[in-house]
């Protein structure tokens, strides 16, 4: 039997047979010499005690050798002891059989020797990666550094920090230093985590980063003194493999051959690293497999093995690096043991340029393509996602080679993907009804995979069934992959990227609707009305669906797929968005059973993250349409946009800004516990004293740009109808307050501002009140709940005395001691104070303060004071 194809148990059986045949060949005198020499033959510092060897016959010796060394290393140990015992003829015959039946690596003995051999094997296997077009490139040449930052849990932590403008831990570029930091604690006091979750959106480069970590480990750059063996586990592939396999089998799949001492490798879990790529594809364990696997030698389903690793019940103490999408992080939390999160944020602007120049071999073409994309601000922003960057480069390369105009660009991910399809088909010279039919079938395959627990691997039989095997679209849009199996190598196919599969899945819903005109878009409605867990899985598919409903997108679908999507699909989708303003729940008056309440409590934590992200995800869907009328109609039934506990990225703000531009009259925006502190990508180099002096003489220091500047600028435009802005439990740096102050001065539609439990400096308070007191400020209602109003009262007095339009001041829930009430009442009596309503709900006031307020009421009878404890 060939060593590479043998299972773990069959290799052990072959080793046992070799040992038995060899030792039975020895005479009693030779066996005696063998036992004495074996006593003095330690392996990794251990040897079999003499008391267990002294009276052992050949059969006993075989059992003890296997028990102590494992089967395959026991064969090599036996051969070496035979040589030292001067039984060279038997040793020579054993070596021949050993190499023939167990493979060349069976002559290795110590773990350190296997470790060195394994690193060399990993370097050979992973030196090159396949691009989406199946071209192999060196990983060091193609890998472009990404930004990696602490996980989103840090957003809430900002509220607990000291007042001021501390810069959060900045995003770091993914070099070896950053990768080495992943398994360190967040601070000096915390212990080193065993599980690190690397999260990010689709196409952001999680898999490439994970493979680069494996490659750098093998090159001796990462975890050198901590990890002896590192294994890459693609979750999607392991879930789809038929049959049962143990963790030991999965480890042997990655070794040069199956004769390796897997038990000894797994015997020290604290020296192992498992990279679980794509853990968002893991479903929950079915009732038939309720418990995770705990035995590395137990043959079971891939799901149980992976679940055992995630929960640290299988090989406790091993290090885990888990990659997943944002939407799945909440579902995984309950299955992970004390994880530490890190977030991949994609390319920095500097790294986008590096990627372009790595992609284009011609420097002039690279410069032209990069300059063109850089001038298109929206398209340039989209290129922070590596897969989108690759698509943009691929399309531009084709257009440059064909001498075409680069003017046709895209503003959304959907339009970029659609342009990619058309460009690839044109470059391949394929068109016509046959290819259109193949594309439809390919979309169906993509959709079936997405709905089947995000199935990403498709067999040759799957393609044959749909008549796609050997088709033109298979060659262009699917990558062929060979997976070594127990008996034979299995050939599978997968889409060039999972996000591209989700794009085609979204397209299939529209193509399905076209086939049944005049009937409700059942497939589309089923997608939109899926439950919370499925909605998280289908978030990107839903986003693409909205993008395809763009008028231009529908026209392209008609041109390239030969179909017309019914008008009612777009109208039904709009009605679905408008229906999101109505909370779903049990009928009024319905009573919940205790069992139902228990189930809801158990699911509450799991669904919390999906619910929190739904508001932002809905905005992304609207953004993808790039149709102002559609967005305005959609938001008309969503009077308040709520974003809660979101660390806003530049792309998030681009999306939010666009939706605010399109919002209808009376629109409100509420940001709750959102991260608004900009993190610098790179520390500035210190200038010399001479340069600093020259700079101070020639230039004036520019105020820092805040994350909210684009939104603040939008608020000042005549077409923006945002009426209410509530900032709750947010840290507001001075830069944000400065930009917001400028917006308050001239925003034509803003009528209400809320600052609820938000953290500001004195400078920030002064800036905001300056904007509120500006003659052209249109804010009529000001709601304030700040930790210490004593710091703001002097600025608030100025606003009350100078603002011509402020009519409502809500200080409900605030602490108002006499030192605050006294100047407040003086300002209310001021002749230029135009206030009509003062709300003091849930406020405790002293007797003196109540008398002061009564005096204000007497002098200004039109002022309504609402007070309750």
UniProtKB/Swiss-Prot annotation:
The poly-Lys disordered region (350-354) mediates the formation of liquid-liquid phase separation (LLPS), an essential step for nucleation and formation of the NLRP6 inflammasome complex. Residues 37-128 form the Pyrin domain. SMART domains: LRR_RI (SM00368), PYRIN (SM01289). GO terms for cellular component: canonical inflammasome complex; cytosol; intracellular membraneless organelle; membraneless organelle; NLRP6 inflammasome complex; nuclear membrane; plasma membrane. Gene3D superfamilies: Death Domain, Fas, P-loop containing nucleotide triphosphate hydrolases, Ribonuclease Inhibitor. CDD domains: Pyrin_ASC-like (cd08321). It holds the Pfam family NACHT. Residues 596-608 have a biased composition (Acidic residues). GO terms for biological process: acute inflammatory response; acute inflammatory response to antigenic stimulus; antiviral innate immune response; defense response to Gram-positive bacterium; defense response to virus; host-mediated regulation of intestinal microbiota composition; necroptotic process; negative regulation of canonical NF-kappaB signal transduction. Residues 194-511 form the NACHT domain. GO terms for molecular function: ATP binding; double-stranded RNA binding; lipopolysaccharide binding; lipoteichoic acid binding; molecular condensate scaffold activity; pattern recognition receptor activity; signaling adaptor activity; vasopressin receptor activity. Highly expressed in the gastrointestinal tract, predominantly in colonic myofibroblasts and in colonic epithelial and endothelial cells. Within the intestinal mucosa, highly expressed by goblet cells. Also expressed in hepatocytes and in immune cells, including CD4(+) and CD8(+) T-cells, dendritic cells, mastocytes and peritoneal macrophages, as well as in lung, kidney, bladder and gonads. The lineage of its organism: Eukaryota, Metazoa, Chordata, Craniata, Vertebrata. Induction: Up-regulated by rosiglitazone, a PPARG agonist, in CT26 cells. Down-regulated by CRH during water-avoidance stress. It comes from Mus musculus. Keywords: ATP-binding, Cell membrane, Cytoplasm, Immunity, Inflammasome, Inflammatory response, Innate immunity, Leucine-rich repeat, Membrane, Nucleotide-binding, Nucleus, Repeat, Ubl conjugation. Disruption phenotype: Knockout mice are born at the expected Mendelian rate with no morphological abnormalities. They are characterized by spontaneous intestinal hyperplasia, inflammatory cell recruitment, exacerbation of chemical colitis induced by exposure to dextran sodium sulfate (DSS) and develop higher tumor loads in response to a combined treatment with the alkylating procarcinogen azoxymethane (AOM) and DSS. The colitogenic phenotype is associated with altered microbiota and is transmissible to cohoused wild-type mice, both early in postnatal life and during adulthood. PROSITE patterns: DAPIN, NACHT. Acts as the sensor component of the NLRP6 inflammasome, which mediates inflammasome activation in response to various pathogen-associated signals, leading to maturation and secretion of IL1B and IL18. Inflammasomes are supramolecular complexes that assemble in the cytosol in response to pathogens and other damage-associated signals and play critical roles in innate immunity and inflammation. The gene is Nlrp6. ATP binds at residues 200-207. Polyubiquitinated with 'Lys-63'-linked chains, promoting the interaction with PYCARD/ASC and formation of the NLRP6 inflammasome. Deubiquitination by CYLD decreases the interaction with PYCARD/ASC. It is found in: Cytoplasm; Inflammasome. Residues 350-354, 577-608 are annotated as: Disordered. LRR repeats lie at residues 460-485, 635-658, 837-860. Homomultimer; forms the NLRP6 inflammasome polymeric complex, a filament composed of homopolymers in response to pathogens and other damage-associated signals. The core of NLRP6 inflammasomes consists of a signal sensor component (NLRP6), an adapter (PYCARD/ASC), which recruits effector pro-inflammatory caspases (CASP1 and CASP4). This is NACHT, LRR and PYD domains-containing protein 6. Belongs to the NLRP family.
């Amino acid at each position: 039997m060939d060593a590479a194809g043998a299972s773990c148990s069959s290799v052990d059986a072959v080793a046992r047979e070799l040992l038995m045949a060899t030792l039975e060949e020895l005479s009693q005198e030779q066996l005696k010499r063998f036992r004495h020499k074996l006593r003095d033959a330690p392996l990794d510092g251990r040897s079999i005690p003499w008391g267990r060897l002294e009276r052992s016959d050949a059969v006993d010796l075989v059992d003890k050798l296997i028990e102590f060394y494992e089967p395959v290393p026991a064969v090599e140990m036996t051969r070496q002891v035979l040589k030292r015992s001067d039984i060279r003829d038997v040793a020579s015959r054993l070596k021949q059989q050993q190499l023939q039946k167990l493979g060349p690596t069976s002559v290795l003995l110590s773990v350190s020797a296997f470790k060195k051999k394994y690193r060399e094997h990993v370097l050979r296997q992973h030196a090159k990666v396949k691009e989406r077009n199946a071209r192999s490139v060196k990983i060091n040449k193609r890998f472009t550094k990404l930004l990696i930052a602490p996980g989103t849990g840090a957003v809430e932590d900002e509220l607990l920090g000291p007042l001021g403008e501390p810069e959060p831990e900045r995003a770091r570029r993914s070099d070896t230093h950053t990768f080495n930091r992943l398994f360190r604690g967040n601070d000096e006091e915390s212990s080193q985590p065993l599980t690190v979750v690397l999260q990010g959106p689709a196409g952001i480069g999680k898999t490439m980063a994970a493979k680069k970590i494996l490659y750098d480990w093998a090159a001796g750059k990462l975890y050198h003194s901590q990890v002896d063996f590192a294994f890459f586990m693609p979750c999607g592939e392991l879930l789809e493999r038929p049959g049962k396999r143990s963790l030991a089998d999965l480890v042997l799949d990655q070794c040069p051959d199956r004769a390796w001492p897997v038990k000894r490798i797994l015997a020290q879990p604290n020296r192992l690293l498992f990279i679980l790529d794509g853990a968002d594809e893991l479903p929950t364990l079915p009732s038939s497999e309720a418990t995770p696997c705990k035995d590395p030698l137990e043959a079971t389903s891939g799901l149980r093995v992976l679940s055992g690793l995630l929960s640290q019940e299988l090989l406790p103490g091993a290090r885990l690096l888990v990659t997943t999408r944002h939407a799945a992080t909440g579902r995984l939390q309950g299955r992970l043991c004390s994880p530490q999160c890190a977030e991949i944020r994609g390319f920095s602007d500097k790294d986008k340029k590096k990627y372009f120049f790595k992609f284009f071999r011609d420097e002039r073409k690279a410069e032209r393509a990069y300059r063109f994309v850089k001038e298109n601000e929206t398209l340039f922003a989209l290129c922070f996602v590596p897969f989108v960057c690759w698509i943009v480069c691929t399309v531009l390369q084709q257009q440059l080679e064909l001498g075409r105009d680069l003017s046709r660009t895209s503003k959304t991910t959907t339009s970029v993907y659609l342009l990619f399809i058309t460009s690839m088909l044109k470059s391949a010279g394929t068109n016509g009804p046959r290819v259109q039919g193949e594309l439809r079938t390919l979309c169906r395959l993509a959709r079936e995979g997405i709905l089947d627990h995000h199935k990403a691997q498709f067999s040759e039989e799957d393609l044959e069934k749909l008549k796609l095997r050997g088709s033109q679209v298979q060659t262009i849009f699917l990558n062929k992959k060979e997976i070594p199996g127990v008996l034979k190598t299995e050939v599978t196919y997968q889409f060039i990227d999972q996000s591209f599969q989700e794009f085609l899945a979204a397209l299939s819903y529209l193509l399905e609707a076209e086939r049944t005109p005049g009937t409700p878009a059942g497939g589309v409605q089923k997608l939109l009305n899926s439950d919370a867990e499925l909605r998280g899985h289908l978030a990107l598919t839903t986003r693409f669906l909205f993008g395809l409903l763009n008028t231009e997108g529908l026209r392209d679908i008609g041109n390239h797929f030969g179909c017309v999507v019914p008008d009612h699909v777009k109208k039904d989708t709009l009605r679905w968005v408008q229906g999101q303003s109505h909370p779903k729940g049990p009928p009024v008056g319905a009573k919940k059973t205790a069992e139902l309440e228990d189930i809801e409590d158990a699911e509450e934590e799991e669904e919390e993250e999906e619910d929190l992200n739904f508001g932002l995800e809905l905005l992304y869907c609207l953004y993808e349409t790039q149709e102002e009328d559609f967005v305005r109609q959609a938001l008309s039934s969503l009077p308040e946009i709520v974003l809660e506990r979101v660390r806003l990225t530049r792309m998030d703000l681009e999306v939010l800004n666009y939706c605010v531009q399109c919002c209808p009259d009376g629109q409100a925006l509420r940001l709750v516990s959102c991260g608004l502190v900009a993190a610098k990508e790179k520390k500035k180099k210190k200038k010399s004293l001479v340069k600093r002096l020259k700079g101070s003489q020639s230039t004036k220091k520019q105020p820092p740009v805040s994350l909210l500047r684009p939104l603040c600028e939008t608020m000042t435009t005549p077409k923006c109808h945002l009426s209410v802005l509530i900032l709750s439990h947010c840290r507001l740096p001075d830069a944000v307050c400065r930009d917001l102050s400028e917006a308050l001065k001239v925003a034509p539609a803003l009528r209400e501002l809320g600052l609820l439990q938000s953290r500001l400096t004195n400078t920030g308070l002064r800036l905001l009140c300056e904007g509120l007191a500006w003659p052209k400020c249109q804010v009529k209602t000001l709601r304030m709940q700040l930790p210490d109003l004593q710091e703001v009262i002097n600025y608030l007095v100025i606003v009350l005395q100078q603002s011509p339009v402020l009519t409502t001041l809500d200080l409900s829930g605030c602490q108002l001691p006499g030192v605050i009430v006294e100047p407040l009442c003086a300002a209310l009596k001021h002749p230029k104070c135009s206030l009509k309503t003062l709300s003091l709900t849930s406020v405790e006031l002293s007797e003196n303060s109540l008398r002061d307020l009564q005096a204000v009421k007497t002098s200004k009878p039109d002022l309504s004071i609402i007070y309750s404890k």
